[in-house]
């Protein structure tokens, strides 16, 4: 049933949600009617209604992500949201980052003038973080919950243990490749700040995102939540983008999001096992307890072109080709990917795959 909501899936194998999530028929119709109101009633009525709707929208966001509405903030995208949030932190704080992490995350700290150090991305990244924290003092750890190139999923249980060992450590997560793809309850997580865009796994279209702050983070700012909200909503906001995210989240609620991500997780686990068995993925992917539904397959431009010719949507990332599975994907999509990869390998036996 879910697949029928997305017209592109009738003629395309779409394995590119990690790049851009699909738009449903329902969201497209909502956006048309939303802008029709603007056209027929004028910008003044359109803007006043948007501000009237803000509280209810944030209540929906808070309910979905597991926190109170006064500590979540709609924003135009991850990049804008993280920079606004970082403006509340003292610049003297030392930050630990990961090399090859999402550039807009690492650049945000550089732009704000924070003292930072980086560790190399590696398959057992949690061990590397632990060793670095032992050797140097850091006030902030910032990382993507899912690494956008490889699909590595950070172990949140490890982050809980880290919090216990370093209770004053502020943990910041880029959730763009995580939110909407995995179950998440912010107030039961180890994070003090999570920000993400809504156009990928949340399927909210362009022009929206979310920022979530822990009670400890808010207390550390010595600001009232009203003052924090004013900074996030300084000037006008993306009215259509915010309304679209609200609509998308209500749709996820209505379609039983928890069941959808369970189905996605099962398909992703099957994809991981098959891709490893066929030696299309490096061994470290199978050695970790958990992985996301994003996979990076070696093959470069030749493989990318071959997949495109076979009507499989994907994207080049790093030295490989990245594919990703969402809940609107099916086992049929996985079988087509595997069949196409095997055909490519037969035709290009000289190329390495892992």
Please give the residue ranges for each predicted region.
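Active-site PLP attachment segment
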Residues: 189-224
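A glycine-/small-polar-enriched, mobile loop at the entrance of the PLP active site in fold-type I
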Residues: 11-58
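Conserved PLP-binding catalytic core of the aspartate aminotransferase-like
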Residues: 265, 269, 278-310, 317, ...
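Conserved beta-loop-alpha segment that forms the PLP phosphate-binding cup at the N-terminus of a helix
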Residues: 50-93, 103-105
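PLP-dependent aminotransferase-like
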Residues: 80, 84-140
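PLP-dependent enzyme catalytic core of the Aspartate aminotransferase-like
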Residues: 1-4, 306-354
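Active-site phosphate-binding strand-loop segment of PLP-dependent enzymes
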Residues: 124-176
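Structural signature of PLP-dependent enzymes
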Residues: 45-46, 229-272
């Amino acid at each position: 049933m879910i697949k029928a909501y997305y017209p592109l899936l009738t003629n395309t194998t779409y394995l590119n949600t990690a790049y851009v999530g699909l738009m449903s028929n329902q969201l497209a119709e909502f956006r048309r009617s939303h802008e029709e109101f603007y056209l027929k009633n004028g910008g003044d009525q359109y803007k006043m209604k948007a501000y009237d709707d803000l509280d209810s929208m944030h209540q929906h966001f808070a309910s979905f992500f597991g926190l109170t509405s006064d500590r979540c903030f709609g924003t135009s995208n991850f990049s804008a949201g993280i920079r606004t949030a970082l403006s509340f932190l003292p610049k003297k704080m030392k930050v630990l980052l990961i090399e090859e992490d999402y550039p807009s995350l690492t650049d945000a700290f550089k732009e704000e003038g924070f003292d930072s150090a980086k560790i190399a991305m590696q398959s057992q990244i949690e061990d590397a973080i632990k060793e670095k924290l032992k050797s140097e003092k850091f006030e902030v750890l910032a990382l993507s919950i899912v690494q956008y190139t490889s699909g590595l999923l950070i172990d949140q249980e490890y982050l809980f243990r880290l919090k216990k060992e370093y209770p004053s450590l502020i943990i910041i997560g880029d959730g763009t490749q995580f939110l909407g793809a995995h179950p998440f309850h912010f107030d039961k997580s180890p994070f003090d700040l999570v920000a993400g865009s809504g156009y990928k796994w949340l399927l909210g279209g362009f022009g929206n995102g979310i920022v979530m702050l822990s009670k400890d983070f808010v207390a550390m700012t010595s600001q009232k939540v009203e003052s924090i909200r004013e900074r996030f909503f300084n000037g006008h906001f993306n009215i259509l983008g915010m309304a679209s995210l609200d609509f998308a989240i209500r749709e996820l609620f209505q379609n039983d999001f928890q069941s959808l991500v369970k189905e996605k997780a099962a398909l992703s686990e099957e994809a991981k096992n098959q891709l490893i068995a066929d030696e299309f993925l490096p061994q470290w992917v199978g050695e970790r307890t958990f992985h996301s539904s994003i996979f990076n397959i070696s093959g470069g431009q030749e493989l990318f072109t071959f997949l495109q010719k076979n009507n499989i949507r994907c994207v080049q990332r790093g030295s490989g080709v990245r594919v990703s599975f969402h809940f609107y994907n099916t086992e049929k999509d996985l079988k087509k990917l595997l069949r196409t990869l095997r055909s490519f390998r037969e035709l290009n036996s000289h190329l390495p795959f892992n």
